[in-house]
Amino acid sequence: MESIGIVAPQTMHFAEPLRLQSGSVIGNYQLVVETYGELNAARSNAVLVCHALNASHHVAGVYADDPRSTGWWDNMVGPGKPLDTNRFFVIGVNNLGSCFGSTGPMSIDPSTGKPYGAKFPVVTVEDWVHAQARVADAFGIERFAAVMGGSLGGMQALAWSLMYPERVAHCIDIASTPKLSAQNIAFNEVARSAILSDPDFHGGDYYAHGVKPKRGLRVARMIGHITYLSDDDMAEKFGRALRRADGALDAYNFSFDVEFEVESYLRYQGDKFADYFDANTYLLITRALDYFDPAKAFDGNLTAALAHTQAKYLIASFSTDWRFAPARSREIVKALLDNKRTVSYAEIDAPHGHDAFLLDDARYHNLIRAYYERIANEVGA
């Protein structure tokens, strides 16, 4: 299927201050967005796609000046694809605190004339949803046909159905969780510690020093990436294969240089990530992950937390995802069923772990395609 082709982001400016869950206020902020497809006359065919930790507004298509800049969910969104832009108007929003153009730690603090750095206020999933609602308002969209996301994006989709129940017809929540486990919070803490202990971090003010805490950011990404892959997938891709600079494939070099293919892969992923991502943003987003827990205000009762939702739901998980295991998705399903909500659930047998939600798997894509066909029939798309 064809890509949506050349796309261009747009920057939306908001003068009305946004009060955050922490009590801090952000004024005069901007959000970078991309849109695909056409909004129909009734404004009933809009779909919001929420991004995960290291992604952005650039969901699909390519930029004219960089043919390699394919959107992070290009296999999912586009003409004739599961989320068909011939039928739906799709919006991608770069969240507050990110490093791809929306107001965040790299932005200039008007009170100092310098980047916010670590002084940028902590944000939450709920803060992002409120900011996204203002984007919807700017487009004149009163109700989304669907809000969709995977991983952290799925948390935002779920939060939308809780916070703006009358504005979400369908919630599509993929490879996600109603809250992080202690183990997941621990992974995030180790990743943050790697960044905070990097001498180049400078208390978050590394911009003024002309450096980036790349060593810490690289380790943080390596830790995260391990959790995104399944044991079987890593065994299939790498096993215990050696990668020696001298070409030898069957002998150790008895040093601490890279020897195994999996080591080489993780270092490559870490280096690539450290080149384009911002360390302060990584700290912010992982903390937003930690804080997400809609049942907290209901004494941990997820059924009570979801009692006032109105959307219909598609919840999907992957068999080998151990970061956000299928059991976590089933918690959401049970709470929704307890509230007699309309829920479709699928656990897809896929070998690729948590990252499976980003990949082109026929069973997975057929599921999403069929669900959007149902939505299209409802809204006349």
UniProtKB/Swiss-Prot annotation:
Catalysis performed (reactions): L-homoserine + succinyl-CoA = O-succinyl-L-homoserine + CoA
Pfam families assigned: Abhydrolase_1
Active site per UniProt: S151, D321, H354
Top EC class for this record: transferase
Keywords: Acyltransferase, Amino-acid biosynthesis, Cytoplasm, Methionine biosynthesis, Transferase
Annotated pathway: Amino-acid biosynthesis; L-methionine biosynthesis via de novo pathway; O-succinyl-L-homoserine from L-homoserine: step 1/1
Domain AB hydrolase-1: 45-360
Record's keyword annotation contains Acyltransferase: yes
Function description: Transfers a succinyl group from succinyl-CoA to L-homoserine, forming succinyl-L-homoserine.
Family, as annotated: Belongs to the AB hydrolase superfamily. MetX family.
Protein name in the entry: Homoserine O-succinyltransferase
Species per Swiss-Prot/TrEMBL record: Burkholderia cenocepacia (strain ATCC BAA-245 / DSM 16553 / LMG 16656 / NCTC 13227 / J2315 / CF5610)
